[in-house]
């Protein structure tokens, strides 16, 4: 069972391995839970796609960015809640919700596909947000399959 921002889940679902069963905002009301970065995590992207690096921004811009994200999340949820309270269908009201909203899903995956996912998403070039989740998955899964993970580590983290 995984709970993460929608933008992280969309990266996760790009892996066409295993099966996913996601919480449905079409049939259930969405909780007021959104991702807001820490001020220290606000950075700028320098370079071309695929070959860029991140650099920190000044404290003022960092604070302003976090406030804008928080405000957007709050306004979006207010609009969503208003529509729900007026009887608008959940499947339509959800259209105003941002990708910073948290979602939940169940993920079923075999060991080989799990190791492929980890080798890609724990890599330093992976998006930091999904890398943190991949690290957590590793911490949960490796004690369950210690022999399998030991062989994977000895094979330079290359899935068989």
Regions from the PLM with identified roles:
Residues 1-160:
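Family-specific signature for flavin-dependent thymidylate synthase
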């Amino acid at each position: 069972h995984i709970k993460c921002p929608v933008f992280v889940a969309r990266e996760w679902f790009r892996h066409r391995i295993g099966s996913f069963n996601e919480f449905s905002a079409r049939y259930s009301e969405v909780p007021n839970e959104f991702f807001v970065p820490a001020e220290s995590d606000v950075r700028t992207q320098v370079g071309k796609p695929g070959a860029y690096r991140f650099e920190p921004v000044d404290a003022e811009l960092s604070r302003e960015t976090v406030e804008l994200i928080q405000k957007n999340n709050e306004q979006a949820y207010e609009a969503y809640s208003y529509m729900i309270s007026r009887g608008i269908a959940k499947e339509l009201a959800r259209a105003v919700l941002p990708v910073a909203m948290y979602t939940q899903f169940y993920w079923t995956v075999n060991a080989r596909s799990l190791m492929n996912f980890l080798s890609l998403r724990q890599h330093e070039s992976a998006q930091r947000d999904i890398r943190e989740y991949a690290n957590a998955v590793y911490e949960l899964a490796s004690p369950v399959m210690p022999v399998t993970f030991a062989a994977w580590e000895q094979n330079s983290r290359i899935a068989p």
